[in-house]
Amino acid sequence: MVSYAITGASRGIGFAFIKHLAQDPSNTVFALVRNVSSSQPLTDLAASHKNVHILKADVTSPEELDAAAAAVSQITGGTLDVLVENAAFLIGEAASFTLTDLVGDPEKTKIFSNDLQLSVEGNILSVVHTTNAFLPLIKKGEVKKILVISTGLADTDAVIEWQWKDNVPYGASKAAVNMVVAQYSNALVEDGVTIVALSPGLVRTQTQDWAPAFYEKVTNIFRKSKPSFEGPLSPEESVRLMLETLGKLTVKDGGKFLSQNGNKDWL
């Protein structure tokens, strides 16, 4: 029996992890969400799968994360095998701004600064808080793996190749997350804990009215560097690939920043 805890589990990639893992009745799956009543599909899934447990945990709150870890410990007997840190601050008001858009524009600068602070809290500090809350359980687990969701937009070489100019707070904060993962790996290697950062690829998680145009735009950008790029993955396909990659990684791979395919091909 393998136990998993997934943050940001109410929708998108996080929910896809829960659906995938719940299919194996020998798994014990913990879905961590900010609001336990925010996702009817998750509630329905938990109702039909006794191995799924929904827990409240805002990843910016160390207190809520500690409480969630305590709840997990009560069910598993003090252990956790795999932690997937998926929750993130993705798209703020400044997502469309380039850095040069801020020049001479105090209002945009203020909005950008706020988004960057939210990204620090939601993407960087959240990883520290989440990892620290569950680390005692992970150390006692059998698998001892932590997967932190990153993005190809955190790779400077890729950003230069793609000529990507916007959503700076997200990409910059995820680049910092990759460093946090590397530092954790250095500290945990002697404990046999494998912690890695994986990009899920371009995944079709947005369903708003603007989403189709956004995915078409991004797909065209990526095809300039990789003409064979087929477009966004479904959350289910991305999760399948990431779990396959995670299963192959060992403590010797700790601290690495890889794609869903286990390499540096972000597309």
Feature roles, as predicted:
Residues 89-135, 139-190, 202-205, 209-212:
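Catalytic loop of short-chain dehydrogenase/reductase
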Residues 22-40:
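Conserved glycine-rich Rossmann-like NAD(P)H-binding loop of the short-chain dehydrogenase/reductase
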Residues 7-19:
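N-terminal Rossmann NAD(P)H-binding glycine-rich loop of SDR-like oxidoreductase domains
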Residues 60-77:
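Conserved Rossmann-fold cofactor-binding substructure of NAD(P)-dependent oxidoreductases
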Residues 69, 131, 181, 239-242:
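Short-chain dehydrogenase/reductase
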Residues 6-7, 85-86, 145-151, 194-199:
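Structural signature of the Rossmann-like NAD(P)-dependent dehydrogenase/reductase core
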Residues 46-63:
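Rossmann-fold cofactor-recognition segment
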Residues 197, 212-267:
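C-terminal helical subdomain
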